[in-house]
Amino acid sequence: MRTVFLPFLWRKNVSDILQSLNPVQKEAASCTEGPLLILAGAGSGKTRVLTHRIAYLIDEKGVNPWNIMAITFTNKAAQEMRDRVDRLVEFGAESIWVATFHSSCVRILRRYIDRLGYDNHFTIYDTDDQKSIIRKAVKELDLDPKQYREGPLLGVISAAKNEMIEPQDFETQAGGDFRMCQEAKIYKAYQKTLIDNNAVDFDDLLLLTVRLLRENRDILEAYQERLRYIMVDEYQDTNSVQFELIRLISGKYHNLCVVGDDDQSIYKFRGADITNILSFEETFPGAKVVKLEQNYRSTNNILEAANAVIANNAHRKEKHLWSENGEGKEVSFIHYETAYGEAEDVIDKIQTEVHMGKHQYQDCAILYRTNAQSRAFEEKCIKKSVPYRLVGGVNFYQRQEIKDILAYLKTIDSGRDDLSVTRIVNVPKRGIGQVTLNKLAVYASEHGMRLFQAMEQVEQISGIGKAADKIKGFVNQIMVFRALAKELDAAELIESILEQTGYLEELEKLEEDKAQAKQENLEEFQNKAADYYANHDEAALTDFLEEVALVADID
């Protein structure tokens, strides 16, 4: 239900809203009309400026919160912005559109993706799902899997989608290049599998939304009319399709505020286009530029070192960070000949600090850029008997047991996802062989249906034999869960799946430590589900799965 906005009931004095900001921050927060580029150096208080700008729009300018959109790059940043705005304004913060690019696109597509030929009940595939499709495509095209590996191929497809190049266009651009021609075939097969499964990948969320807005003037105008004031954080990290999305939505009122720092652009390998921020004034005529150069996080010695390094960039917007935090300690720079020499010296320095009583091991941390760099440090820690803990590892949602239960939930929610059905049909083991699954897949293909639909018609398929009863048992169990899903929340449904399928019993057959770890992960998953339902009124299983998909692959 849309909130009725009556700003005159509680409007604050402008000085109350902006009094905690420095003069330049105030300038940025109070500039509300037309395109605005806020060049925000590291530690310069950009989130503070954005949240106060939103509060200023509502309380001073009388803008309806419903008409404000703030785009972030992570769910964590979106939640932080929501919380801060909620503390600043007395009413209406819940109506502000604060979300990531991907969450925003899901929100739009859930309403209108049927205009593009999809069912609104679509599934969002994660990286593992994508790799499975690539392997299938490579096999069906009879290509060498060693020459056409999933990771690089997904990179090619993602790069194409980020540049809004769809399969047919990619094929045209391939020309006579043999490798590109094969990649075009894989891309085409990959996209067909997604469409057949009523599924999208993360790049599709953006690409399909842009296509939807371009092809449907009524939808575009509706969002332009609603989202009259748009703010985008980390603008230096936007790619071509994200730029086009923002350009389209801001096309009527032109009240676009972007915050970023070209000096912090490090995601070119993910498709980020630095020209989006460098050419902002040319792209949006009449744009104002405000520079936030006062740093609140570091000392001047650190900032001068950073300024000296970044000054070597050939193409950048001039800015010079400074601080009132004093000079601080001098920055040391040490060059090592080898990775092992570096690790040896770093571990020796840590041991010296500990032996002198200045620190404990738990006070020390080693940061590295790539996972491969950890090996040298780990080996030196072991050699010198230094206790350590490696932070990171497997993403929670990529763990086998979590993927299994997610596949159950997806199958219960929608039987159109063949990957999920294939994953769980023998989890726990049901004795359904690959030959049987192949026959089901052939039947499904010949009759233009999904795998689960073929399973429902198993009695009509010749050559299945005794396996038919096992298939019917699986189908019946899913149908029971579907009925339960109408009455239970996701946490309760997970509990039923674990108990009724015998999944927990299978875990108990594993080694004690391994079984316990998996059980704890499943309990944590149930807790996450319970928390989601507690914080979202009228939440449905589809909503929870959407939340998991966005959190798992974005953050």
Which residues fall in each region the model found?
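Conserved phosphate/pyrophosphate-binding and hydrolysis machinery centered on Walker-type P-loop NTPases
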Residues: N22, I71, V98, T123-T127, ...
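N-terminal pre-P-loop "Q-motif" helix
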Residues: L18-T32
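A basic/glycine-biased coupling hinge at the interface between accessory DNA-binding modules
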Residues: R2-R11, S15-D16, E33-L36, G41-S44, ...
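Conserved helicase motor core of SF1/SF2 NTP-dependent helicases
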Residues: S44, V232, Q236-H315, K319-E324, ...
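Short alpha-helix plus adjacent loop in nuclease-associated cores
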Residues: S104-Y112, D263-R270, R297-S298, V391-D413, ...
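Conserved helicase C-terminal RecA-like lobe
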Residues: W10, T172, G176, Q360, ...
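Helicase P-loop NTPase motor core
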Residues: S44-L50, I113, P285-K288, E293-P387, ...
